[in-house]
Amino acid sequence: MRLTYLPLFAGIAIQSASALPDFFKSSVLKPRRTNSLLINPDAQPDLPTAQQASTAAASVGLNLTDIQGDILIGMKKNKEMFFFFSIADATAFKSHLDSAILPLITSTQQLLTVATQPTTAVNLAFSQTGLNALGLASQGLGDSLFASGQFSGAESLGDPGTSNWVQAFAGTGIHGVFLLASDTIDNVNAELSQIQSILGTSITEAYRLQGEARPDDQQGHEHFGFMDGISNPAIDGFSTALPGQAVLSPGLFLLAEDGDGSSSSRPSWAKDGSLLAFRQLQQRVPEFNKFLADNAALTQGNADLLGARMMGRWKSGAPVDLAPTADDVDLANDPQRNNNFNFTHPDFTETTDQTHCPFSAHIRKTNPRSDFNPLNTANHIIRAGIPYGPEVTDAEASSNTSSTDASLERGLAFVAYQSNIGNGFAFIQQNWVDNANFFFGKTTPPGIDPIIGSNAAQNNFAPNSPRPVSGLDPTDSTTIVTLNTDFVVSRGGEYFFSPSLSAIQNTLSV
């Protein structure tokens, strides 16, 4: 792990004070930290420096002081709380929002330099019913999935009904979510207590979920053990692309910016906001590990290779497309190389060859790269999730079974940002992940994503529905393996809108 995260700047910590909203100027210049609240595993791309981001943003007209901080940062949070709430008194809530909550909201620019990071970063997003409660029901955001909410579309996402959903997500009762991130849970809890004290009886708590990076050398890895957050795209006007990294227009993630195909249907105040897809995804780690052990014969007895072929990366983060037979930690920890591949090789037959990366591998299903020609630039998300829950206990490991004790549940607090949910998260889940024939044109159908895919829609929405997967055996691409266990179980979620800071001040608080 890198010992430092971002350089400390004295004179260029933020964009000029004249560019800041009035509510922001009084506190942002006060250094509050000497160490970053973010993590920076070697395998993940670095964030730009404040100066680099300011220069890039100016070239395309982005205002990083007005964009909430979580949207463009990616999977770099250390400790994070998701505090879901309902609005009980809209008038009081709006008054508190303007006078006391708004100064706590953290912008993108603030997070890029340690000296300007707050003790705890705070972001805020609203569901459609939350916007309705604030009097904005008539001002739609031009996104039908956001408007209807996630609960009504659960089965279209592959969920076997909603019996496994956390009760708070069932329906449309959640109006908003605070996202609080810091380097200690005590900091997060203290900031949440302050917010609750400010808002008082204007809100009621619906649910909370505590996430945190896994310990020690597992920092940056999700609970199955794989390094995460390597392949987020580069954003024009914010970050510089590394080799193999897609460079995408900001409007794919920020409403009404260049590249947003629905700009004409957005209200003016929605500019520079983003649509947040949240999912609580339970990971059944003992069951996953048992499957690898029981089926290692598919990969000549190498359970780690089987897992790598299912994911598309070794646990280190090294891609199997570049390291098809053995892990390569040096490759994994080199952002100049670990994303620089496209699933093609000399003398490959692209419709049949799965010797390097299976067609069904998770990272190929969710980011097909040169399986598209020309490269796809429409269906992308920025992932900003974090693991939740404790490590696997000895009892779970020995029994190969996840505990039914709710306090031992573990998984991923999945967060995806996009400007159009139907082109982003929902499209990827429905049309790629859960589609046994995607990517099209392969001689042997790829099958369903073996990590997060679901075949429930083809089996009367039954849990643990059998799902076909090809390519796990590197010596026989025609072998179809049937998975009979869901390694990832949806516990529900919701769609939110993360508004700009100026929208919070000038529209949502009015």
From Swiss-Prot:
Residue ranges annotated as propeptide in the record = 20-58
Under Enzyme Commission nomenclature, its number is 1.11.1.-
Q: Name one GO cellular component term.
A: cytosol
Give the cofactor note text: Binds 1 heme b (iron(II)-protoporphyrin IX) group non-covalently per monomer.
Q: Which GO terms describe its molecular function?
A: heme binding; metal ion binding; peroxidase activity
Q: Which residues bind heme?
A: 362
Q: Which UniProt keywords apply?
A: Heme, Iron, Metal-binding, Oxidoreductase, Peroxidase, Signal
Signal peptide positions (record)? 1-19
Record keyword Metal-binding present = yes
Indicate the residues that form the catalytic site. Answer: 228 (proton acceptor)
Q: Does the keyword Oxidoreductase apply?
A: yes
Q: Which GO terms describe its biological process?
A: carotene catabolic process
Q: Which InterPro entries match?
A: Dimeric_a/b-barrel, DyP_N, Dyp_perox_C, Dyp_peroxidase
Cofactor(s) the protein requires to work? heme b
What the protein does comes down to: Peroxidase capable of degrading beta-carotene.
> Subunit notes for this chain?
Homodimer.
Query: Which family does the similarity line name?
Result: Belongs to the DyP-type peroxidase family.
Q: What is this protein's name?
A: Peroxidase 2
Look up and give the organism this protein is from. Answer: Mycetinis scorodonius (Garlic mushroom)
